[in-house]
């Protein structure tokens, strides 16, 4: 299949995957915001935000590092044993991360009141995250058979979605939500096991040394993936320490809407990443940028304009106070897209992972320092947190744009 056709196919299935990833929460959102009290929905949003952070931790950049390694092995038609060893070591490394993640959850539950008060709900939610280790998304991405991953995800979420609609009617049934996620994840793991058998893949004895080395390799990818989630997670966690569950609900809803949009647009970068690994073409990345950034800018403006009416339809009148927060945070849509494009598909493929990591760490520290400064001086408000989120994304953009211009001569023409 020609490269362009493969890119289109990969991008189509990744976009469909992300559409489903965004659609299911949006479909369930108007139901839960109307059935649950604002306070309980705030608790739900807070726990979900923490779980999104932990999901990135458990993934630890393997969606890029392991995908890249498997794609190279597959392209070179290397020894199948080497292929299976990478899969096994990656799985073992992620299990270690999953166990460490459990320790992190328990520590957070001790110090964060919302998590402590919803302990069983928090632990059940994390177990659903832990089960994602066994879905092998990195494998299907590396083999460029993304349709398997997408179809499985849609089936899994459909089951969870339908169960939630029928059985979650009021506040005291909140625990059902992660239990349904666990049930659907188990079904998905069963489907994945059948696909592994079809591919005639087998697990070999894991190497602890190789697994730890893979963690070291993936760390820089993790830091990059961590950026958008870290910005959102840090902001929400700080708000949860200071503000009421109702205010957490307003901010969490805003982050959920904007974050889902950012993730959807970010799939373009995932779609072109394998091709950029092969070509390292400046012309190609410029073509993609010139065609997409004006559209993303127009989309961002549209979100800002139509937020009030959209929020009223989506969540109901009681969440209208969140409209101004969403309008501020919407500015990050454009810059987040540019940052994703300038990250691994651009700087990463010319072996400037260090610069991608530096930009991520620097902007994350800026975000955290700004929030803690406002907190220390008693000047923390929801709108100021949203504004800091925008400025942080702009800081990240400026750093990555500087590196792109500095190293642009290293691309192929």
Model regions and ranges:
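Membrane-interface junctions at transmembrane-helix termini in multi-pass inner-membrane proteins
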Residues: 119, 129-152, 278, 333-361
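Signature of the first transmembrane helix
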Residues: 6-63, 161, 220-245, 299-300, ...
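Helix-loop junctions and terminal segments of transmembrane helices
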Residues: 59-77, 258-281, 343-349
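Hydrophobic alpha-helical transmembrane segments
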Residues: 126, 150-199, 255, 362-366, ...
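Transmembrane helical elements of multi-pass membrane transporters/channels
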Residues: 10-25, 149, 155-160, 177-197, ...
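Small-residue hotspots at the loop-to-helix junctions and early N-terminal turns
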Residues: 41-45, 49, 245-256, 323-327, ...
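Membrane-water interface segments that mark the loop-to-transmembrane alpha-helix transition
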Residues: 9-21, 47, 52, 56, ...
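Interfacial segments at transmembrane-helix termini and the short loops linking adjacent helices
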Residues: 109-125, 306-337, 379, 383
């Amino acid at each position: 299949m020609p490269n362009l056709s493969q890119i289109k196919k990969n991008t189509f299935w990744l976009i469909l995957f992300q559409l489903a990833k965004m659609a299911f929460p949006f479909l369930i959102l108007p139901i839960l915001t109307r059935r649950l009290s604002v306070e309980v929905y705030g608790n739900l949003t807070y726990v979900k935000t923490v779980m999104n952070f932990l999901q990135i931790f458990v993934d630890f950049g393997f969606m890029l590092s392991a995908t890249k390694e498997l794609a190279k092995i597959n392209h070179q038609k290397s020894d199948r044993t080497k292929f299976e060893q990478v899969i096994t070591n990656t799985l073992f490394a992620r299990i270690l991360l999953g166990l460490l993640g459990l320790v992190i959850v328990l520590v957070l539950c001790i110090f964060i009141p919302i998590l402590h008060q919803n302990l069983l709900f928090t632990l059940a939610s994390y177990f659903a995250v832990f089960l994602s280790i066994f879905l092998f998304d990195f494998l299907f991405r590396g083999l460029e058979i993304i349709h398997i991953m997408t179809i499985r995800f849609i089936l899994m979420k459909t089951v969870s979605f339908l169960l939630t609609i029928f059985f979650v009617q009021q506040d005291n049934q909140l625990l059902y939500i992660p239990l349904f996620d666990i049930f659907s994840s188990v079904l998905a793991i069963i489907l994945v096991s059948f696909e592994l058998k079809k591919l005639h893949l087998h697990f070999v004895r894991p190497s602890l040394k190789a697994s730890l080395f893979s963690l070291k390799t993936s760390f820089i990818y993790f830091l990059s993936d961590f950026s958008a989630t870290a910005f959102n997670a840090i902001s929400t966690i700080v708000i949860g320490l200071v503000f009421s569950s109702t205010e957490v609900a307003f901010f969490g809803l805003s982050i959920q809407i904007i974050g889902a949009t950012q993730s959807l647009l970010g799939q373009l970068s995932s779609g072109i990443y394998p091709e950029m690994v092969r070509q390292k073409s400046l012309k190609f990345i410029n073509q993609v940028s010139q065609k997409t950034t004006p559209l993303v800018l127009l989309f961002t403006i549209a979100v800002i304009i139509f937020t009030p009416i959209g929020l009223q339809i989506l969540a109901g009148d009681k969440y209208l106070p969140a409209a101004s927060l969403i309008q501020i945070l919407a500015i990050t849509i454009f810059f987040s897209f540019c940052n994703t494009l300038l990250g691994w598909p651009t700087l990463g493929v010319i072996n400037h992972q260090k610069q991608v990591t530096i930009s991520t760490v620097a902007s994350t520290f800026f975000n955290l320092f700004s929030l803690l400064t406002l907190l220390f001086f008693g000047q923390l408000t929801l709108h100021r947190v949203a504004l800091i989120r925008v400025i942080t994304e702009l800081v990240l953009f400026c750093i990555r744009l500087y590196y792109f211009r500095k190293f642009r001569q290293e691309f192929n023409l």
